[in-house]
Amino acid sequence: MKTAIIYRSKTGFSARYARWLAKILHADLYRYRTVDSDLLASYDTIVYGAGFYCGRLSGCRWFRKISEPLAQQRLFVYATGSMPCVQPRDLQKEWDMSFSRDFQKRLHLFYLPGGMNYAVLNPIDSLLMRVYRRAMLLSPFTAPDTRRLMLRLDRSVSYMDRGAIQPMTRTIYANH
């Protein structure tokens, strides 16, 4: 099974999961936008990982574009986020913002807990996150579990868990 792992990471969480997956799966590791459809055509399995930002997967348009011609490859996508866990209905909303339902049928989708690392965010992203956090805390429509998370996001936090990739690796091996 020839596997390519592609990642896009702003805060390091998606990159760390990508390195773990590459080691376990004996896969080739690539940064976002360093590959194209021609290179990926030689792989059986393609994994793309990135963070959710503002309700969508970072780089989702790019991934959709390069994977469209790859009809024979098995496609896996993981998203990292600042929540330790996500309600399925909320997660589906984010997948729907990222990919059409038809395209989702081609994908095996996974959520991996990431966190927040203010130290590596650029000033604009840091400001946007703080404004978003404040808006969520002030909104009367914010769900209680989201409110609890927003209270914790006043500082850097990590929910990374190496064990979180096990369902994904099992699915990749099972579909080989």
Where are these regions (language model features)?
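N-terminal beta1-alpha1-beta2 submodule of the flavodoxin-like/Rossmannoid cofactor-binding fold
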Residues: 1-71, 166-176
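FMN-binding flavodoxin-like domain, especially the glycine-rich phosphate-binding loop
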Residues: 55-176
